């Protein structure tokens, strides 16, 4: 505290001054209450420091004795100096350093440890150096790591091995020494540390208040006495005023919005009055919301390989409401186009994600008096109900077809559409085209299983494969074995009615075993497709391609007649390979004779027609009876017996000559044709000598033949519940093939006419001549009727022949 003092003021003449005599001088204690006394100034110390005992005693002694007493001072510890002890610790070899402040360079030097060795550590280090070399710095680093890793609890030996990258013996020796020294040490740590107080000033360990740590306080202006509490109050008041200003601005904006809404409502009423919309029809038309696109949770997979670039669609919460701005004007409604029904039933739409579309509120859905007023600020406003979305659920999603403005669209061609087998309104060739059959490829030569052919964009041929349980076995089948089956099959005719379903097809393709599938191929109940090869072997065949077709068909007829039956029917007798080769040579020689006669008599053909006018009318009908000689008739009569194994190799040779076929028929486009049972009438002109080959069916429970004969008169051949179809005319040979024959009744015995075939054929001793006109008519007839040529295959029937 400072002593009492007076402030110098100007004397006032109006106020009397007190006059004291020397003996009447008042004491010091009486002068304390004088009003002119200057208030005590702050000493610059805290209250605790001012009340400290030594400080108060020193101040009081100075005031009383008017001088400084040596005994009345703050005690300070004396500094003792022992020169001898100092000289013993620090030698007199001191050198003045060049600089006292050292700056650590910015390098990767290892940090020096905080632990310093003592004499006890040197003793241990000397003992360890006898067995291994260890430096003092290395020892200090080890002790320093152990000290810093331990707090109140010491680290274990295993943890010390992880901290110290040294030898196990050295680590164990240093660890044991460190633990023993740590326990003997009175302090908490072996490394001396400077005592540090807390920064908040809460430590009161120092007895002298003057040396305690000060707390950081906020500096305020002393003249206005703004302490920390008043400053905080001012900050709070500022925040409250800022909040009030923000609320006032929001209220101002709300009132402006309500005023604009009122003006817009008045404009809408005026416009409706001018348009005459007193019933609200135009207003309701405008209020119809626009259709929003659906939000899909899973992005559609792109087939261009850039799957890593597809952004993920985030699923939004359904409780959020988006207000969509919509102009309140007359909007033209979007024209809806009718969607065509999809014919493909196999293609099922992908399941949509379980994400509901986001709720959207349009401006037009809000009623004209749905705005808030100033009275109901505390109550939340409930929006008007949402309008119904009239958009249809399109299964195509974002890939749905949408017409663009300025584009002209044409109707699709119905003849180029690829229909699926499941369509019920298909009939004829359209249904036949979708049939799957066993397919063989040429390059590479292998079987790919069940497939169907269709024409793709740009004329490319596309094979649609059908997965079955026999794919692994069918791919291992030798294509040469299927070539023998397909070469003997006949033409598949379209069905008479579209009532036939695919149940039998799926049964034949998916539910049958492999032996049954091969049996169905041989019995013409299942198809086998092979691509056609268009290449010839020599130049002679390129000149007479149409003639070669006739010879090839004759060869296929002869090879089909030699096939055996698989239903247990055996017939005595047979032919050898030499006879078959002889018959083939005779057919080739016959064709060469016909070609030679055509070239020789080409110039004299007109004169022959004038000299024989009657022969022209009957030339086309007489050609059927003048094409077989006696040797060929005998060979055809013996064709009812089983054929040996080498015959199949001959058939394969004919196929490899450049005419691969589908079930024995050369198809122009390679499309497989289904097999159907239809009723066909076998007719021939009366009075014409014909040789007809008729297939007879062998019942699996009988051991005799059931021939079906074809006479010269028109008639319909029926047998049981099936009909004979596919009559093929090869000059004078007619082949009738049964399709899907099922015998439900007991068959009859063979007719006597069939038993006379051999004797009648042997009685033909003369060889009829072949006229050019008859040959030309027969060749022309075959060229114009390629689809009627059918061949017998490896079936469960035998063949009989009648010569009339």
From Swiss-Prot:
Keyword Nucleus among record annotations: yes
Record localization: Nucleus
InterPro entries recorded: Enhancer_polycomb (IPR024943), Enhancer_polycomb-like_N (IPR019542), Enhancer_polycomb_C (IPR009607)
Main location: nucleus
Positions with biased composition (Polar residues): 611-624, 654-669
Keywords: Chromatin regulator, DNA damage, DNA repair, Nucleus, Transcription, Transcription regulation
One Pfam family here: EPL1
GO cellular component: NuA4 histone acetyltransferase complex; nucleus; piccolo histone acetyltransferase complex
Positions of region (Disordered): 372-395, 484-508, 603-624, 646-669
Source organism superkingdom: Eukaryota
GO biological process terms on file: chromatin organization; DNA repair; regulation of transcription by RNA polymerase II
Function: May play a role in transcription or DNA repair.
Family assignment from sequence similarity: Belongs to the enhancer of polycomb family.
Protein name: Enhancer of polycomb homolog 2
Organism: Xenopus laevis (African clawed frog)
Lineage, broadest ranks: Eukaryota, Metazoa, Chordata, Craniata, Vertebrata
Gene name, Swiss-Prot/TrEMBL: epc2
């Amino acid at each position: 505290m400072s002593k009492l003092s007076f402030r110098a003021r100007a004397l006032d003449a109006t106020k009397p001054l007190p006059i004291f005599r020397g003996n009447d001088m008042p004491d010091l204690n009486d002068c304390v209450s004088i009003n002119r006394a200057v208030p005590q100034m702050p000493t610059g110390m805290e209250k605790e420091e001012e009340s400290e005992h030594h400080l108060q005693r020193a101040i009081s002694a100075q005031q009383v004795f008017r001088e400084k007493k040596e005994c009345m001072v703050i005690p300070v510890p004396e500094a003792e100096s022992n020169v001898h002890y100092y000289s013993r610790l620090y030698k007199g070899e001191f050198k003045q350093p060049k600089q006292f402040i050292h700056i650590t360079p910015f390098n990767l030097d290892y940090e020096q440890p905080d632990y310093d060795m003592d004499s006890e550590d040197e003793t241990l280090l000397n003992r360890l150096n006898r067995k291994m070399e260890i430096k003092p710095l290395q020892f200090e680093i080890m002790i320093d790591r152990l000290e810093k890793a331990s707090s109140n609890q010491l680290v274990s030996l295993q943890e010390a091995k992880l901290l110290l990258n040294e030898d196990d013996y050295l680590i164990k020796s240093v660890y044991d020494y460190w633990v023993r020294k740590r326990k003997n040490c009175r302090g908490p740590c072996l490394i001396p540390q400077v005592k540090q107080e807390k920064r908040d000033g809460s430590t009161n360990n120092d007895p002298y208040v003057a040396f305690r740590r000060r707390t950081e306080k906020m500096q305020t202006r002393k003249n206005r006495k703004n302490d920390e509490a008043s400053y905080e109050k001012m900050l709070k008041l500022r925040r409250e005023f800022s909040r009030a200003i923000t609320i006032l601005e929001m209220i101002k904006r709300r009132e402006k919005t309500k005023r604009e809404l009122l003006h817009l409502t008045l404009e809408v009423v005026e416009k409706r009055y001018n348009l005459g919309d007193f019933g609200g029809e135009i207003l309701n038309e405008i209020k119809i919301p626009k259709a929003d696109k659906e939000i899909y949770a899973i992005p559609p997979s792109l087939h261009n390989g850039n799957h890593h670039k597809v952004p993920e669609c985030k699923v939004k919460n359904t409780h959020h409401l988006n207000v969509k701005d919509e102009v309140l004007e007359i909007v033209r409604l979007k024209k809806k186009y009718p969607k065509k029904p999809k014919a493909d039933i196999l293609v099922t739409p992908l399941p949509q994600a379980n994400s509901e579309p986001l709720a959207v509120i349009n401006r037009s859905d809000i009623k004209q008096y749905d705005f808030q007023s100033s009275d109901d600020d505390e109550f939340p406003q409930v929006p008007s109900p949402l309008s119904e979305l009239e958009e249809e659920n399109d299964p195509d999603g974002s890939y749905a077809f949408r017409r663009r403005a300025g584009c002209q669209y044409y109707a699709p061609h119905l003849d180029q559409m690829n229909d699926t087998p499941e369509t019920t309104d298909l009939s004829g060739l359209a249904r036949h085209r979708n049939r799957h059959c066993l397919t063989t490829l040429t390059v590479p030569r292998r079987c790919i299983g069940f497939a169907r052919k269709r024409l793709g964009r740009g004329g490319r041929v596309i094979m649609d494969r059908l997965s079955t349980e026999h794919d692994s076995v069918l791919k291992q089948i030798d294509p040469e074995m299927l070539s023998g089956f397909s070469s003997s099959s006949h033409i598949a005719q379209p069905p008479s009615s579209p009532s036939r379903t695919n149940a039998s097809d799926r049964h034949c393709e998916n539910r049958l075993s492999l032996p049954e599938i091969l049996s169905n191929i041989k019995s013409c109940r299942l198809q086998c497709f092979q691509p056609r090869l268009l290449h010839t072997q020599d130049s002679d065949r390129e000149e007479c391609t149409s003639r070669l077709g006739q010879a090839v068909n004759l060869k296929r007829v002869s090879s089909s007649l030699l096939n055996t039956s698989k239903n247990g029917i055996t017939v005595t007798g047979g032919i050898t390979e030499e006879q078959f080769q002889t018959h083939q040579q005779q057919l080739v020689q016959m064709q060469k004779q016909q070609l030679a006669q055509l070239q020789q008599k080409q110039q004299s053909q007109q004169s022959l027609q004038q000299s024989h006018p009657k022969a022209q009318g009957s030339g086309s009908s007489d050609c059927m009876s003048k094409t077989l000689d006696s040797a060929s008739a005998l060979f055809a009569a013996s064709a009812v017996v089983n054929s040996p194994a080498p015959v199949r190799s001959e058939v394969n040779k004919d196929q490899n000559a450049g005419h691969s076929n589908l079930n024995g028929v050369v198809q122009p486009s390679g499309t497989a044709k289904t097999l159907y049972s239809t009723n066909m009438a076998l007719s021939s002109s009366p009075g014409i000598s014909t040789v007809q080959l008729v297939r007879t069916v062998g019942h699996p429970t009988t051991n005799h033949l059931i021939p079906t004969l074809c006479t010269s008169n028109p008639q319909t051949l029926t047998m049981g519940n099936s009909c004979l179809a596919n009559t093929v005319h090869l000059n004078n040979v007619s082949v009738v093939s049964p399709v899907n024959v099922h015998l439900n009744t007991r068959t009859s015995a063979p007719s006597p006419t069939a038993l006379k075939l051999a004797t009648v054929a042997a009685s033909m001793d003369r060889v009829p001549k072949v006229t050019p006109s008859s040959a030309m008519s027969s060749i022309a007839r075959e060229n114009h009727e390629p689809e009627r040529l059918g061949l017998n295959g490896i079936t469960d029937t035998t063949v009989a022949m009648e010569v009339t």
